[in-house]
Structure formats: structure tokens, C-alpha cells
Amino acid sequence: VTWHDGSELTADDVVAWWERIDDVATAAPYRGWYVAVEAVQAVDKHTVKISLKNPFGPLLAALAALRGSAIIPRALAKDRGNLGAKAVGTGPFKLSRFVQYDHLHYVRNEKYWEKGLPHVNEMTFKIMVEEDARVAALRAGQIHYAYLTGEGAARLKDDKNVSVLRSPKAWLVIHVLNSSRKPFSDKRVRQAISLGVDRQEVLQKAVFGEGSLSGPVPTGHTDWFIPVDKLPYKPDIPRAKQLLAEAGYPNGFETTIKASPQYPEFVNASVVMQSQLKRIGINAKIIQLEWGQFIKETFTQRPMDYDLKVTAWTFYPDPHHYLYQWWHSKSPSNQDYKNPELDPILEKAMASTDREERKRLYFQAQQILLDEAPQIIWYTGMNIEAVRNEVKGYVQSYTGRRIAFKRTWLEA
């Protein structure tokens, strides 16, 4: 297997991947996936040895995950600040041109390891932030593919030249409550908010009903998730007000919700939540931030600065990543929530390789999170993509993150 620049992929490149993730200076957001890894060594040119500090059930899933597992050449790994401009991979398409905020142009990788693929010789990704522009371009035949929201899909339902594709997506849209600061440090306040909101209304208004209610592990994620009919999601306004009064807030309180317009559905969900919170006396101001600033304030800086923030946990192939990564007190990605009852359950599940035991432990962990309510879980979404009818061979991905065109072609 060769890199796009012609050099050979070797075990040393895999070691460089690990060194980059393990380096504190990298501040890798997915370092928590590999907490059990002690060392990664190159045994020979094509063999890698991974040593663990302790048994780690999710290892294979973590290595297979889309995020955190991308290998790049060692030489390129040294240039951490400019990876976006010097993309080198081993995939079916090579990046030939990148015009920031405008487009990316790819050409066929003639040395791709799967013979006969890809089918097309070149491909251009246009950066089109506005959905109206994407819909119009699809209608006019200026583009062949676009990612859409439920609103955009509705506008294309009568277009005979375009097919709208749908599939469940492990995209868990949530509002995180900052459990490290008042008033959200009081469990009763968090429970009041959970009882005071209507998740079905948010699903309908934020994404036109394109999705499903969900627990801490996304609905549809093999057999790790709690069925929707078992979730404690029935709104109870009187009980919510009672809990607020017991916590010392009989008249409610003022708070803020941080969101980024990078994802319109996040803002939509926040607007609906804002309206719902008023029913129990909570007045929430929505603060919209540019995506980079949002990530800095609410994720990377310590302490994180937010009352409530809206985000999404994207696809992970193992429930460990929805539960341990965000909610174990010692995880590098912990979301300002600490629970001595939860930690040992997650540790046992992480150390086990018995699927049934892990399933039992993860169900316990999910029940604790549902009761403690450090996050308000709205829904797991839908992949909504549209293709012109001349596009053949395109298959949707459950991750919602892997857009694969190596088996796609255009029919005249």
C-alpha cells in the first residue's frame, strides 16, 4: 500500500499516529478512546504491536472508528499545524486542489489497492453552506450530490430528477448541563429540566421529525440501546416546578444556552428548548458562537465556559465512547460531571470482553445517566442525502460521517 505521494505505508507510520495522539501538546479530543494503551511499537515493516495497561474491551472498535484512527505519514505528522493543506492518504481519491471556503478537487488514485476502483476519474466537492443553494444546484444539475436537512428534503420531494435517500444516523443531539456550576450542580434542577421539556416537540420542530427519540446510547445501535418506550421522557410540568422549588428556585432562574449556527438544527433545538423552559420559570438566553469559538469555550478550554451547550455525539462503534468518554470523571473528555457510583460501572464494562456482561453494565450506566440528567437527549438523527438520478452505486453510511464514492459512477 502506498501513500498518495508515492511513499510506502509502513508500521512506523502507525507508530507516528499513536505518538501524535499520546502527545499532550496535540490535545487530541479522542485521546480518551485509548486510555488503556500503554505503547505502540513497530515489530517489523508491516507488523504493529499494541501493548495495553489493562484489559480493554472496546479496543478493536476504537481502532476501527472513523475519528481518532486516521493514519498519516510520519513525515507529515511532524507538521501538525498544516495537516489540512497537505492531505496525504491511501484512499481511492487524491486531493489535487484545495481552495479554502470554496472547493476541493480530487483525482483518481491510479495505485489504489482495490483494483478497478474508483470508477470516476475526478470529483469536486463544492463548499455550499446555504442549503437553499445546494437545493437549487441539485435541481439545475450543477451538482450530483448534496447533504440535506429535513427541510431541504421536503423541497425536493416532487423533483423527478432527484432521489432523496434516508437512513438512521448515530447522531445524538443533546444539550449538556454544566454540572460543575450552580444551579446545575443540583441534581433536582437537572431533573426538573428533563421533566419540563418535550423531546417529541423538539424532534418535530428542529428537524421536521427526521429522527427518533433516544437514550444515552443511540437508538438502533445494535443491542446496546434502551428501547424508546422504556425511556422516562414523559413531560411533567408540575413535578418539574416542585423540584425547582425544593432546590431553592421557586421562581426559576436566568441562564444561557451556547450554540453554533454551523449546525442549524442545534440552534433550532435551542430555540424550542428556550420556549419550553419558560413553562417552568427558566429564562434562557441563546448565545450563538462561530464554530471555532464555540469549541474553544465549551470543550477545549479548562474550565469549560457554559451553562448549557448544544452539541451532538457522533457515531462510535462501541457504547464505551458514548458513556466512558464523556461521563467518567477521569476521562480527558469529561463533561463537567462526576459520579462515584457511575465510574466503577464504566470501568468494569471497559475491562470486560464478555459482551453480555458489558451489555448489563452499560444498561446500568444508562439508567444512572437518565436519572442524573447531566444531558438532555433529544433525538438520534437521519442521514438525508440527495443524488441526481444519473448517480449510480452510491450507498449511505450509518456513521453519517463517511461519504464514500469509490463505487459510484455516473450514467449518461
Ranges and model annotations:
Residues 2, 111-156, 283:
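Ligand-site clamp/hinge motif
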Residues 6, 144-148, 275-327, 361-363:
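Periplasmic binding protein-like
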Residues 8-9, 30-75, 97:
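Surface-exposed binding/hinge segments that line
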Residues 60, 155-158, 180, 184-221, ...:
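Periplasmic-binding protein-like
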Residues 64-122, 130-132, 237-238, 242:
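Gly/Pro-rich hinge or "lid" segments in bacterial periplasmic/extracellular proteins
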Residues 93, 212-246, 261-268:
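Structural transition elements
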Residues 280-295, 322-389, 412:
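Extracytoplasmic/peripheral linker and loop segments enriched in polar/acidic and small residues
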Residues 385-412:
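Long beta-strand-rich cores associated with HINT superfamily self-processing modules
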